[in-house]
Swiss-Prot record:
Chain positions with Phosphothreonine modification: 570
Consequence recorded when altering residue 593 to Q: Found in a patient with generalized tonic-clonic seizures; likely pathogenic; decreased sodium/potassium-exchanging ATPase activity
Name of the molecule in the record: Sodium/potassium-transporting ATPase subunit alpha-2
Record note on quaternary structure: The sodium/potassium-transporting ATPase is composed of a catalytic alpha subunit, an auxiliary non-catalytic beta subunit and an additional regulatory subunit. Interacts with regulatory subunit FXYD1.
Extracellular compartment residues: 107-129, 307-318, 790-799, 864-915, 968-982
Described purpose of this protein according to its UniProt entry: This is the catalytic component of the active enzyme, which catalyzes the hydrolysis of ATP coupled with the exchange of sodium and potassium ions across the plasma membrane. This action creates the electrochemical gradient of sodium and potassium, providing the energy for active transport of various nutrients.
Mutagenesis or variant effect for residue 764 to P: In FHM2; loss of function
PROSITE patterns xref list: ATPASE_E1_E2
Membrane topology summary: Multi-pass membrane protein
Region ranges (Interaction with phosphoinositide-3 kinase): 80-82
């Protein structure tokens, strides 16, 4: 079985590739898997089958033979998907993406410290501290992200059902229970209602056996299983049962024809684990961002390295400067900020029923431009419900309310009494025990979906069905089978002590053929042409709504011929099944979930295309698509246009039709180009009767258009598509383990509407990360410029390394994280999905705003404070220029200031460190304004308001921390930070105000002139 795959699937790609043979081989194997299942066991006669598997069809295998086959084939279990070892996951967190930048910074710091230690007698330890702190930051955040992902994968593991499955096999003529893993090819296996099918079986005998194939094919109706070969395609034929589907009723015997990975289910699981997964958009964004920052850092570093050499510094000093500038450019706190932002959003989404398995998927959902959604259970409730009935020549809507307040017809009608009696009696579904206190619509039933729907409908409108059945005991029955397409039962009548009533339901046209009269207003009248036309119209109308229609009829058996105690023979029929009395039609549908139409509308206004992909019938699919708004009102398909204009479909220009329903069998014969054509030209698309492999091809088609695709699914059949999509969304309640394994996110309530919440959260996190990064990067400029002036103008160093760390890992952290809590701006779900090519997380405009505009104002504020303090101490700006070498000379203890006072080395250093502290305080003051302007990208702060409590806490926290670092006793020794005069705090205030006013004016122009020059240059 192939594992690993090419990124792009097209038949042409495999031949065109001349790359390594191994890759081609893998692609070829995966293409094989993408093709439909090939097997011929369903075509063999029973004798040929016995010969092929060397098995006696009545006694089963011998124990010896079973052991040999088990040794040859291995246990009957799916190979678990290749998992990443924990240490690899941990290393990825430690060395992936952003961490690399910090590691390089740390190594450069140790290098610089090494050079200084070799050159100087008393080297300063700044670089050593910085290196250690950087390494610590990476390790702590790495552990944090690893813990987060491990936690959500723990939740994943709890989904796996740990019970070892049992299977009933017959070996050497004895029935025995064994673990399903020990079942081998050729085993004779029995399954009954409620069992999971232990392997792929070829049925050799069955009694009313029905299986639920929905996890494999997506069909919600149970499928009949019998020994007859009915279809070329093994997935459609009746005589094959598939591994891990459920048997819902009846019993069957079969020969095992495939086990483990060789089963149809196994092939799909292998296909899913073999697909290569692309990188998440946010990972690419962070990489792009690292390249940008590194570019800026290296450019600055190298230019000042050259400059310092020109200015006459020694090589070694120049290298120290180079390293210093590069490290000053590294935003140390940003890694932690990004991780915390993603984690917070993941937690917030979990509260809204979206469990995110890997943190980066949170953002992917926000950039989604196409959602391919499954129908059954995601858009619909996965609960068949009676929708309409037709009797007395009128269509009535069914009343599904608990208190029957929505009745649309007179319940006293004798025809309705007859119809409800047939629906309740000719019905094998029952409520499971102990649910008397639960509302009827929520109760669990045993029986197939349509019968359960009828049961609930009759229970609601006529009271207890069980009592009705007790009053009319069943004496004979013919279960539904696909040849005669009806179900019949005979009951003793409660209203006459001697006679019986025969009740029948089934496919409407078959039922009508057996009737000669029809019940209208409680009277039997002949079934004439007029009534047949009325029936036909009602049948077509209900069928066109995508509903499953059943016909009902009855016959009161004459008591003379069929007295009580009469032996009805259901094999050799000894009672009439013709000339019955037609009573009415009832139609059922799996109704859309209540919140879905609204959610689809939100997707549309957010520029997201919703495509329905289902295994169900095209008419049903189209009806639901219209019901939930995937096909919006007034939009027509080619068929609709042809019907309206009364012309053949070939004459309609397909481009005129906005909507389109594609049948799986047509999709099979399409080339990639034709599929692309459909995806390009139609805005509203429904794919019906699709196979799992086709789902994958549809996803790849959307990705070829450059879309970011989200796929929802619950069945095993969805797992390849879930894996291939940019974000796979599995269902938490109805989803199979395989689909949960392949997905990136799990909807705990199975509701499509939760996806829209997810999209909003994803867009919000992208916006908020942008804001966080803009905020964090801005303070880089006031941190770097002091260093540059120190080199160029030869002034005493205005801001030290330790104080830079106090900003990046101290005061800036909480405010940066608080932006993750910022509420969405008003246009968040009205924008088009972001284009991953042009709309980057960090773009040139963001860098120019943070570095070139706001950052420069901040730096001015810091230098203003610096020059004020030195001037107050007697060093005017003119005296400072070129003073650096004397200032830093330990032997010089009589340096004169502008007024002729002499300063010792120790005294000078205390003033210098006080300046560091004041510069630090000024940065905190200007970062207040920066934090407030970063709250919004387009709206005014006054529109947005200050509702973000965490942000207000962040403002207070950074101020308190700055004051603590300045005034706490002992800081002078520990971090060389000294207490400041109160007035020095206010030096930067005007600059803070300037930043706020400057940005509010900019945003006003943005809103007044959208698309103008200001937007092009400054909107990040």
């Amino acid at each position: 079985m192939g594992r690993g795959a090419g990124r792009e699937y097209s038949p042409a790609a495999t031949t065109a590739e001349n790359g390594g043979g191994k890759k081609k081989q893998k692609e070829k194997e995966l293409d094989e898997l993408k093709k439909e299942v090939a097997m011929d066991d369903h075509k063999l006669s029973l004798d040929e089958l016995g010969r092929k598997y060397q098995v006696d069809l009545s006694k089963g295998l011998t124990n010896q033979r079973a052991q040999d086959v088990l040794a040859r084939d291995g246990p009957n279990a799916l190979t678990p998907p290749p998992t990443t070892p924990e240490w690899v996951k941990f290393c990825r967190q430690l060395f992936g993406g952003f961490s690399i930048l910090l590691w390089i910074g740390a190594i450069l710091c140790f290098l610089a410290y090494g050079i200084q230690a070799a050159m100087e007698d008393e080297p300063s330890n700044d670089n050593l501290y910085l290196g250690v702190v950087l390494a610590a930051v990476v390790i702590v955040t790495g552990c944090f992200s690893y813990y987060q992902e491990a936690k959500s994968s723990k939740i994943m593991d709890s989904f796996k059902n740990m019970v070892p499955q049992q299977a009933l096999v017959i070996r050497e003529g004895e029935k025995m229970q064994i673990n399903a893993e020990e079942v081998v090819v050729g085993d004779l296996v029995e399954v009954k209602g409620g069992d999971r099918v232990p392997a792929d079986l070829r049925i050799i005998s069955s009694h009313g056996c029905k299986v639920d194939n929905s996890s494999l094919t997506g069909e919600s109706e149970p499928q009949t299983r019998s020994p007859e070969f009915t279809h070329e395609n093994p997935l459609e034929t009746r005589n094959i049962c598939f591994f891990s589907t459920n048997c819902v009723e009846g019993t069957a015997r079969g020969i095992v024809i495939a086990t483990g990975d060789r089963t149809v289910m196994g092939r799909i699981a292998t296909l899913a684990s073999g697909l290569e997964v692309g990188r998440t958009p946010i990972a690419m964004e962070i990489e792009h961002f690292i390249q940008l920052i590194t570019g800026v850092a290296v450019f600055l570093g190298v230019s000042f390295f050259v400059l310092s050499l020109i200015l006459g510094y020694s090589w070694l000093e120049a290298v120290i400067f180079l390293i210093g500038i590069i490290v000053a450019n590294v935003p140390e706190g940003l890694l932690a900020t990004v991780t915390v932002c993603l984690t917070l959003t993941a937690k917030r989404m979990a509260r809204k029923n979206c469990l995110v398995k890997n943190l980066e998927a949170v953002e992917t959902l926000g950039s989604t431009s196409t959602i391919c959604s499954d129908k059954t259970g995601t858009l619909t409730q996965n609960r068949m419900t009676v929708a309409h009935m037709w009797f007395d020549n009128q269509i009535h809507e069914a009343d599904t309310t608990e208190d029957q307040s929505g009745a649309t017809f007179d319940k006293r009608s004798p025809t309705w009494t007859a119809l409800s009696r047939i629906a309740g009696l000719c019905n094998r579904a029952v409520f499971k025990a102990g649910q008397e206190n639960i509302s009827v619509s929520k109760r669990d039933t045993a029986g197939d979906a349509s019968e359960s729907a009828l049961l609930k409908c009759i229970e609601l409108s006529c009271g207890s069905v069980r009592k009705m059945r007790d009053r009319n005991p069943k004496v004979a029955e013919i279960p539904f089978n696909s040849t005669n397409k009806y179900q019949l039962s005979i009951h003793e009548r409660e209203d006459s002590p001697q006679s019986h009533v025969l009740v029948m339901k089934g496919a409407p046209e078959r039922i009508l053929d057996r009737c000669s009269t029809i019940l209208v207003q409680g009277k039997e009248i002949p079934l004439d042409k007029e009534m047949q036309d009325a029936f036909q119209n009602a049948y077509m109308e209900l069928g066109g709504l995508g509903e499953r229609v059943l016909g009902f009829c009855q016959l009161n058996l004459p008591s003379g011929k069929f007295p009580r105690g009469f032996k009805f023979d259901t094999d050799e029929l000894n009672f009439p099944t013709e000339k019955l009395c037609f009573v009415g039609l009832m139609s059922m549908i799996d109704p859309p979930r209540a919140a879905v139409p609204d959610a689809v509308g939100k997707c549309r206004s957010a520029g997201i295309k919703v495509i329905m992909v289902t295994g169900d019938h095209p008419i049903t699919a189209k009806a639901i698509a219209k019901g939930v708004g995937i096909i919006s009102e007034g939009n027509e398909t080619v068929e609709d246009i042809a019907a309206r204009l009364n012309i053949p479909m070939s004459q309609v220009n397909p481009r005129e039709a906005k909507a389109c329903v594609v049948h799986g069998s047509d999709l099979k014969d399409m080339t990639s180009e034709q599929l692309d054509e459909i995806l390009k030209n139609h805005t509203e698309i429904v794919f019906a009767r699709t196979s799992p492999q086709q789902k994958l091809i549809i996803v790849e088609g959307c990705q070829r258009q450059g879309a970011i695709v989200a796929v929802t699914g619950d069945g095993v059949n969805d797992s390849p598509a879930l894996k291939k999509a940019d974000i796979g969304i599995a269902m938490g309640i109805s989803g199979s383990d395989v689909s949960k394994q392949a997905a990136d996110m799990i909807l705990l309530d199975d509701n499509f509407a939760s996806i829209v919440t997810g999209v909003e959260e994803g867009r919000l996190i992208f916006d908020n990360l942008k804001k966080s990064i803009a905020y964090t990067l801005t303070s880089n400029i006031p941190e770097i410029t002091p260093f540059l002036l120190f080199i160029i103008a030869n002034i005493p160093l205005p801001l030290g390394t330790v104080t830079i760390l106090c900003i990046d890992l101290g005061t800036d952290m909480v405010p940066a994280i608080s932006l993750a809590y910022e509420a969405a701006e008003s246009d968040i779900m009205k924008r088009q999905p972001r284009n991953s090519q042009t709309d980057k997380l960090v773009n040139e405009r963001l860098i120019s705003m943070a570095y070139g505009q706001i950052g420069m104002i901040q730096a001015l504020g810091g230098f203003f404070t610096y020059f004020v303090i030195l001037a107050e101490n007697g060093f005017l700006p003119s005296r400072l220029l070129g003073i650096r070498l004397d200032w830093d000379d330990r032997t010089m203890n009589d340096l004169e200031d502008s007024y002729g006072q002499e300063w010792t080395y120790e005294q000078r250093k205390v003033v210098e460190f006080t300046c560091h502290t004041a510069f630090f305080a000024s940065i905190v003051v200007v970062q207040w304004a920066d934090l407030i302007i970063c709250k919004t990208r387009r709206n005014s702060v006054f529109q947005q308001g200050m509702k973000n409590k965490i942000l207000i806490f962040g403002l207070l926290e950074e101020t308190a921390l700055a004051a603590f670092l300045s005034y706490c006793p002992g800081m002078g020794v520990a971090l060389r930070m000294y207490p400041l005069k109160v007035t020095w705090w206010f030096c930067a205030f005007p600059y803070s105000l300037l930043i706020f006013i400057y940005d509010e004016v900019r945003k006003l122009i943005l809103r007044r002139y959208p698309g103008g020059w200001v937007e092009k240059e400054t909107y990040y």
